[in-house]
């Protein structure tokens, strides 16, 4: 029976996100949800969860970003509302509905997981940080924020934002992810630092070229002014000599 419900959940969410999610959500789309579901299963299987716990997690993973179909603001709460309505209509146990709701809410940016299940979903939702495709996903998120939130970042600002998230705001929680994903996350962090270093170097080169061009421009202006001055002096001298010649002629 539970397998049938999981299939219904998958079908419902696939249909909802395919039809109602705005195309501006380039990162938080059906593909992201499917990846989170797969990563949730991967962690669950490696940690040996009970069937019920694994099912609760999978349901929460499917529903965790459905709220984006209504609004970006407080989308986790909206996701809970959508999940609760669906699960109640399918006679899902009340205590399990509450667990699913709590799991969805832990995917909020600054939420701290309190249970093992919450740690698993929190880690699965951030699996992209350790992905070989991190920079592709990161680029999609940047464009999504620009389209949905109107937030535009310079390369310098975007790199700084990512460094802050990697080093200060994010951590993996489960034993499985700490053991298996930390190294790949560090690799991506190292690449971000390299990008920052390259950006600084490129900016320095650009500034030096700009200064060199300005210097060259200033040097080219000076001779022109010098020539103008020379012609003015020559003209003045010519006029003076002419005046002298005229004066002498008059005297004679």
Language-model features, listed with the residues they occupy:
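Divalent metal-dependent phosphate-bond-processing catalytic cores, especially two-metal-ion Mg2+/Mn2+ enzymes
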Residues: 4, 21-51, 63, 92, ...
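Short alpha-helical hairpin
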Residues: 2-19, 221
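Generic structural signal for well-ordered, non-transmembrane alpha-helical segments
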Residues: 34, 232, 236-239, 243
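Glycine- and acidic-residue-rich phosphate-binding/metal-coordinating active-site segment common to enzymes
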Residues: 76, 84-110, 116
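Short, charged/polar, low-complexity loop and linker segments
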Residues: 216-236
């Amino acid at each position: 029976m539970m397998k049938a419900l999981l299939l219904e959940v998958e079908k419902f969410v696939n249909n909802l996100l395919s039809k109602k999610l705005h195309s501006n959500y380039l990162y938080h789309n059906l593909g992201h949800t499917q990846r989170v579901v797969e990563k949730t299963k991967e962690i669950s299987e490696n940690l040996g969860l009970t069937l019920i716990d694994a099912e609760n997690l999978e349901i929460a993973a499917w529903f965790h970003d459905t709220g984006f179909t209504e609004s970006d603001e407080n989308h986790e709460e909206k996701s809970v509302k959508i999940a609760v309505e669906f699960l109640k209509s399918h006679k899902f146990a009340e205590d399990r509905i509450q667990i699913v709701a709590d799991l969805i809410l832990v995917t909020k940016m600054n939420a701290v997981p309190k249970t093992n299940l919450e740690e698993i979903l929190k880690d699965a939702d951030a699996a992209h940080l350790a992905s070989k495709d991190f920079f592709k996903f990161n680029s999609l998120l940047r464009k999504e924020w620009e389209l949905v939130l109107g937030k535009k970042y310079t390369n310098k600002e975007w790199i700084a934002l990512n460094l802050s998230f990697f080093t200060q705001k994010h951590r993996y929680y489960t034993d499985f992810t700490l053991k298996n994903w930390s190294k790949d996350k560090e690799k991506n962090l190292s690449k971000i630092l390299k990008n920052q270093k390259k950006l600084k170097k490129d900016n320095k080169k650009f500034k030096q070229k700009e200064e060199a061009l300005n210097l060259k421009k200033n040097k080219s202006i000076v001779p022109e002014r010098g020539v103008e001055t020379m012609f003015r002096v020559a003209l003045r001298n010519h006029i003076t000599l002419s005046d002298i010649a005229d004066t002498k002629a008059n005297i004679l």
